[in-house]
């Protein structure tokens, strides 16, 4: 267990290295921070921190930098989450409230996260497996052609054309629309098949074929749109890796191109708190020089998707965690109100 003084030294090393991007020496630490001890004592503390693997000496530099282990202790014990200021919160809310649909919400969220954190932003579309049906609309386009519109609780809208086996009248259409919504509105996608199993029975024989076709189209839509989707932005921020940029950029970009890798990373976010994966804690080798900060978001207090950022391990953890958490909260509010 590290002493309180050595924890203060480690915190100072992390803060200085993040701020200056240069290895940190004992003289600089005593000048910049009120540690209450001499440079010689700080040197001894740094030697102990190095022996325990919390800091390391890069190449021949006289200074030290945090290791993954050092960053982990900093995040778990020393960092806390930096809250957003009132003007920042208002700016986030106003920007997100301008969205016109779900795609716009996700696009604005990506742009906002990248700007706030100066990292690569990754936002997962709300998962339909966790979604509920808000409404199913049926529109007549021709005597034997309908449009089915599925609207989810997260504001996602899916449209499908339905070619009917026979003409379908307005009265039958209104009846089907009412019966269908009475069964599925507010229910989870996974429950829908069982809920509509016998829906065609009350209809006249000549209409049952169309009702069955509509139900088949609805169920196919639920399956088709179950594929997970992501949006990424701010890859230009990778240049903030600094001196190591030429060495790390290719493997990081390759990892970011693999959607399954990103989905797995975001999937590690624990509800409701912020999850931080540092350096070699990331299973994908291409991301061993990065940290991933992620959190779930959704309406009604239940996460339906994840969002987060990817950046160098040398990141402002308190600020990044605060921004990710705040954006997730406001996105959830927007979805609940949409």
Swiss-Prot record:
Question: Is Ligase among this UniProt entry's keywords?
Answer: no
Q: Which domain of life is it from?
A: Bacteria
Q: Give GO terms for biological process.
A: negative regulation of DNA-templated transcription
- Which InterPro entries does UniProt cross-reference here? GAF-like_dom_sf, HrcA, HrcA_C, WH-like_DNA-bd_sf, WH_DNA-bd_sf, WHTH_transcript_rep_HrcA_IDD
A Pfam family it matches = HrcA
Q: Which UniProt keywords apply?
A: Repressor, Stress response, Transcription, Transcription regulation
Family label: Belongs to the HrcA family.
Instruction: Describe the task this protein carries out.
Output: Negative regulator of class I heat shock genes (grpE-dnaK-dnaJ and groELS operons). Prevents heat-shock induction of these operons.
- This chain's protein is named Heat-inducible transcription repressor HrcA
Organism expressing this protein natively: Streptomyces coelicolor (strain ATCC BAA-471 / A3(2) / M145)
Quick one: which gene encodes this? hrcA
